[in-house]
């Protein structure tokens, strides 16, 4: 498969509801992460790959990156309860609406330390929408 990729970063705020009452997560020991239940800030780092069908700027890098950045505006992202995986899923649906029938891979990382890498087949948004309905 042939693809291009772009990167960008956005400041965002999110939280992990219920983490403070889940005994697997609110342990009171070295592995306690109950603090994640409070709104907290990250720099979310995105890397987005998209399938292209030829080698002469099928999708131009800079235009694709600028379009992705504009999706999120200039303010910090208010993500509420969304995980990196949920952020990637939402972005994949939006990308496939503009660029249908293309394989997409999205990496979303918190502070470039921890994150996810998600792969979406060329019909992901159709399947995702059918699951929601």
Regions of interest found by a model, annotated:
Residues 1-133:
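Charge-rich, low-complexity N-terminal segments
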């Amino acid at each position: 498969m042939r693809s291009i990729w772009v990167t960008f970063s956005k400041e965002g705020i999110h939280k992990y509801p219920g983490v403070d009452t889940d005994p697997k997560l609110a342990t009171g020991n070295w592995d306690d992460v109950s603090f994640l239940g409070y709104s907290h800030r990250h720099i979310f780092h995105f890397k987005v790959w998209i399938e292209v069908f030829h080698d002469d700027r099928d999708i131009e890098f800079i235009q694709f990156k600028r379009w992705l950045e504009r999706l999120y505006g200039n303010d910090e992202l208010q993500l509420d309860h969304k995980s990196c995986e949920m952020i990637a899923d939402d972005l994949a649906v939006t990308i496939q609406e503009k660029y249908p029938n293309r394989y997409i891979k999205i990496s979303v990382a918190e502070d470039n330390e921890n994150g996810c890498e998600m792969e979406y087949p060329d019909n992901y948004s159709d399947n995702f929408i059918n699951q929601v309905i």
